[in-house]
Amino acid sequence: MVNEIKQAIANILHELFPNAEIYDEDVPQGFKTPSFLIIVVESSYKKAIDEKYNASVSFDLAYFPEREYESKNECYEVSQNILRAFDVLNSYKVTNKTSSITDNVLHVKFTVKYREIKTSQFEKMRDIIFN
């Protein structure tokens, strides 16, 4: 499920910022800018009723701006676009959206909540022969 959500994040980022590189969990040496780094910060998975589960995954999107000398203005603009676009990811609700700039890197943090229903695997009935 987490990989599905990460892919949805990457798809939206690619639509909003087609020229930006998108990295997953790790930035390679000599990475290109502008770029995004998608990081899973925390996840929880709690049993609700019967076979139902409530889950949440918290993300940190780090944005490395292209222009070093105007990085804060670029970060403000990118932050605004992301916060507006990230309300729902593939029908998953996005909550707790915040953004901050640290050392000229934008961090947009949010949580994705979803529910799962586990289905039990039973052996199928065989044919019944009546006489």
What are these model-predicted stretches?
Residues M1-N3, Y45-I49, N54, T95-N131:
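Short, charged interaction patches at domain edges and termini
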Residues M1-S44:
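Small/polar-rich, solvent-exposed N-terminal microdomains that initiate assembly or binding
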Residues I9, L13, I82, L106-F110:
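Hydrophobic beta-strand residues in large extracellular and virion-surface proteins
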Residues E21-I22, Y92-K97:
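Short beta-strand elements
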Residues Y23, I39, A62, T111-K113:
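Residues in well-ordered beta-strands of folded domains
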Residues K32, L37-Y76:
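A contiguous binding-surface segment within folded domains or other stable secondary-structure elements
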Residues Y69-L89:
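Short, hydrophobic/π-rich interface segment
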